[in-house]
Regions:
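Double-stranded beta-helix
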Residues: 9, 158-221
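Short, surface-exposed loop/helix-turn segments at secondary-structure junctions
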Residues: 58-62, 130-135, 185-198, 230, ...
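A short beta-loop-beta micro-motif enriched in histidine and acidic residues
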Residues: 106, 137-148, 199-200, 206, ...
Length: 311
């Protein structure tokens, strides 16, 4: 179901929106099963190689990878980030209910960005704590004048305790803030504290079927996960062709089109082949300084220092 006028107004005013009951349950279930299958394949491989000593077959989707990862972080490698290129991942990327909303944002010509990510946020692990950043901080500058919506899709009920997303509302119309490369286990890019908007953070818990919608300029972060569960989520990005190749390291594809419908990807095997055969032509052209090269008015506010949790 498309967004209402009120929802669209909230998104454009605040820079985010939690749209409830968007994704049919089968898309989430199928992706959970696909991830579980890949985790099982990897666990058996590592077990045969002697890298892990237990398979933990009795555990389910929200627990098994966490237990396996206590012996080897290589367990989640085949599903982490943009690694997964199988059928259920493709089906979620091309979910009609998501594309209907994206058409409201970017028009009828829709590129599914190559920068999609599966996020297995393990409990009580520092690499799951992601600092304040804007997606455009990672992008090539060609996208700076374009809307690149993010769809953050929980694969479990993402509560505050499990480390749901947090946003800085109505801070998305000031362009790309200065970022730096923080000294973190997590993806290190962080908004420079001297440039961080003085805005009260808002946690955005979401349930299965919901989508947290953000702009590419919306500052957001993720805190720790003491829930004991893996906070599984996927973030997807879409854009009009005019936004350009802002993530040249990874291949996106045409997900919907009225102009060239024959070029729309309809088979996951096309998607899988595209991802595996893609040869990056260049890197994003935006450059940020490392934490030990930057200057800070108040070093205690660096993102690689402990920050307060919204509880």
């Amino acid at each position: 179901m498309p967004l209402t006028d009120e929802q669209l107004e909230h998104y454009h005013r605040e820079g985010y929106l939690v749209a409830t009951d968007v994704i049919p349950e089968r898309y989430i279930h199928d992706l959970q099963e696909e991830i579980s299958s890949v985790i099982d394949e990897q666990a058996r491989k590592l077990y045969a190689e002697g890298e892990i000593t237990e398979l933990h077959e009795e555990l389910g989707f929200l627990h098994r990878a966490a237990e396996l990862s206590k012996e080897s972080r290589n367990v989640i490698g085949p599903v982490n980030g943009g690694s997964l290129t199988r059928c259920a991942m493709f089906n979620l990327l091309t979910c009609p209910e998501i594309l209907d909303i994206m058409e409201q944002f970017v028009g009828p010509e829709i590129i599914a960005s190559g920068i999609y990510r599966i996020r297995p946020k393990l409990p009580d692990k520092p690499e799951g704590i992601v600092p304040w950043h804007q997606d455009s901080g990672y992008f090539d500058t060609c996208a700076d004048e374009h809307l690149v919506p993010t769809c953050w899709v929980p694969l479990m009920n993402a509560t505050i305790e499990a480390g749901c997303m947090e946003v800085l509302p109505h801070s998305h119309k000031q362009g790309v803030f200065r970022h730096y490369k923080a000294n973190l286990h997590a993806p290190p890019l962080a908004v420079h504290p001297d440039h961080l908007p003085d805005t009260e953070p808002v946690p955005v818990p979401a349930d299965i079927g919901d989508v947290v919608l953000m702009t590419n300029m919306t500052p957001h972060r993720s805190t720790d996960n003491p829930s004991g569960l893996i906070r599984w989520a996927v973030d997807l990005r879409y854009n009009a062709p005019e936004a350009g190749d802002y993530g040249p390291g990874e291949a996106g594809f045409l997900a919907r089109s009225t102009k060239t419908p024959a070029q729309v990807f309809t088979d996951w095997r096309e998607f899988d082949r595209l991802r595996k055969e893609h040869v990056p032509q260049s890197k994003a052209d935006r450059v940020w300084l490392k934490y030990d090269e930057e200057t800070f008015l108040d070093p205690s506010k660096r993102a690689d220092k402990p920050f307060p949790k919204l509880r």
